[in-house]
From Swiss-Prot:
<dbReference type="InterPro" id="IPR036740">
    <property type="entry name" value="tRNA_intron_Endonuc_N_sf"/>
</dbReference>
<protein>
    <recommendedName>
        <fullName>tRNA-splicing endonuclease</fullName>
        <ecNumber>4.6.1.16</ecNumber>
    </recommendedName>
</protein>
<dbReference type="GO" id="GO:0016829">
    <property type="term" value="F:lyase activity"/>
</dbReference>
<dbReference type="GO" id="GO:0000213">
    <property type="term" value="F:tRNA-intron endonuclease activity"/>
</dbReference>
<comment type="similarity">
    <text>Belongs to the tRNA-intron endonuclease family. Archaeal short subfamily.</text>
</comment>
<dbReference type="Pfam" id="PF01974">
    <property type="entry name" value="tRNA_int_endo"/>
</dbReference>
<dbReference type="InterPro" id="IPR006677">
    <property type="entry name" value="tRNA_intron_Endonuc_cat-like"/>
</dbReference>
<dbReference type="InterPro" id="IPR036167">
    <property type="entry name" value="tRNA_intron_Endo_cat-like_sf"/>
</dbReference>
<dbReference type="GO" id="GO:0005737">
    <property type="term" value="C:cytoplasm"/>
</dbReference>
<feature type="active site">
    <location>
        <position position="159"/>
    </location>
</feature>
<dbReference type="InterPro" id="IPR006676">
    <property type="entry name" value="tRNA_splic"/>
</dbReference>
<dbReference type="GO" id="GO:0006388">
    <property type="term" value="P:tRNA splicing, via endonucleolytic cleavage and ligation"/>
</dbReference>
<dbReference type="GO" id="GO:0004519">
    <property type="term" value="F:endonuclease activity"/>
</dbReference>
<keyword id="KW-0819">tRNA processing</keyword>
<feature type="active site">
    <location>
        <position position="128"/>
    </location>
</feature>
<dbReference type="GO" id="GO:0003676">
    <property type="term" value="F:nucleic acid binding"/>
</dbReference>
<dbReference type="GO" id="GO:0008033">
    <property type="term" value="P:tRNA processing"/>
</dbReference>
Length: 183
């Protein structure tokens, strides 16, 4: 099916296809709607807005054909190039997104938790995200204060605060999770 590239988003106008994408993996968000539970999807009559990470992932999997404003198909490599051009650390962050998606997790924005991603086992409205993921730039450190802040945040929302990075030498995704424990 088709999505239309608009800036750094891809719009899926075909409502039936949009519903299917959302039901199958909670991809994107419906225009004008905040949170939509799986059993409410059939009532939605709005386009689906996909972020660049989601659109690239679906295009690489052959589930989505992205069309540019000029009417020509935008290849996954071109989507990645656009991301690199407009977003800092695009390749590393996409690799982390893809890592979780390939493991079967649902990956949504973690902005409301001060994180890059919220990662669900089943999906929003079905379960709570067990972890929030923060991107740590390769070769950069993190302060003890930042770790404490992340740990406190994750404790208050009952989630594992997870640092994620990509090793420059191997391209491997590395995760480090923090949680609170009563001693």
């Amino acid at each position: 099916m088709i999505g239309y590239l608009r800036g750094l988003a891809v719009i899926v106008e075909d409502v039936e296809f949009a519903r299917r994408l959302y039901k199958e993996g909670f991809y994107g968000r419906f225009l004008g709607y905040d949170k939509v539970k799986r059993d409410e999807v059939e009532k939605i009559n709005a386009p689906l807005i996909l972020g660049l990470y989601e659109a690239l992932y679906l295009a690489e999997k052959g589930r989505l054909k992205v069309m540019g404003e000029d009417g020509r198909e935008v290849a996954p490599e071109e989507l990645a190039a656009l991301g690199r051009e407009r977003m800092r650390n695009f390749d590393e962050i996409y690799k982390i997104y893809k890592y979780f998606r390939d493991l079967g997790y649902v990956v949504k924005s973690g902005l409301k938790f001060g994180a890059l991603f919220s990662v669900y086992e089943k999906g929003p409205g079905i379960d709570h995200a067990p972890m929030v993921v923060v991107f740590l730039e390769p070769d950069k450190g993190i302060s003890a204060t930042d770790i404490t802040r992340g740990g406190r945040l994750s404790h208050s929302v009952r989630k594992t605060w997870t640092l994620a990075t990509v090793l420059r030498q191997t391209g491997e995704v590395v995760l480090l999770g923090f949680g609170w424990a009563r001693l």
